[in-house]
Amino acid sequence: TPTIRQLLFSIKAEEAIQAALEQLKAGHKPIIQINRTMESNYTSLIQPGMAMPKAEFALCLLNCLKDMFKYKALAATKKGKAVKYYEVEQTFDMKDLKKFFNNDEAKKAYDFLVKKINSTDTSLPLSPIDYFVQSLENKGYKVGEMTQRKTILKYENIKVGATGKTHAVMRKKIDKKRMASDFNNGVLDVLIGNRVMSSGISLHCSDAFTDQRKRTVIT
């Protein structure tokens, strides 16, 4: 499930940072490959221009809680004698629960879970990719992100830790070839991106490139 993938990604973030630092200190250029950016797990909680006091992984569990109120129903369109059926996603409103429960028991249970999630501290980042990038940048390295993410979480102070205060910021559209050139010619020290990021470009060490440091792939 998306939440399990998010958890595994968040757990591995610190390990990936240390692995990248080791390669950089050895004189290599790390290329970090990821399966997904997990952007949707936080864009449902925060929009560009907003601040998040605590970028805690546990907050993505709020998405799971909200998903419990979603269900699929059959709808139909009729054209002449032909009837076409299709699925539509609908959402229960909290008020709808009163149709099934005679008291506020369900509402109290929901509020309890929300409070529990908001107070949970796992010390894991809500956006592992942002924690990785900004942790390395804080060490003085230049990192390029080759993904299609539109919103990033900018840490107010990365030194505070993985779950510090962040601000949601719109990300500029990247020029894939330009970023590859910057990596190959020494402007960037590290690349992180989806597994298909290198399609159509060369990230290998070559005499044609200024930066001759050995490339190391970390997955």
Description of each model-found segment:
Residues 51-219:
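Conserved RecA-like P-loop NTPase helicase motor core
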Residues 41, 46-50, 61:
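Soluble C-terminal extramembrane regulatory/interaction domains of multi-pass membrane proteins
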Residues 1-45, 110-142, 148:
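Conserved helicase/translocase motor-coupling segment
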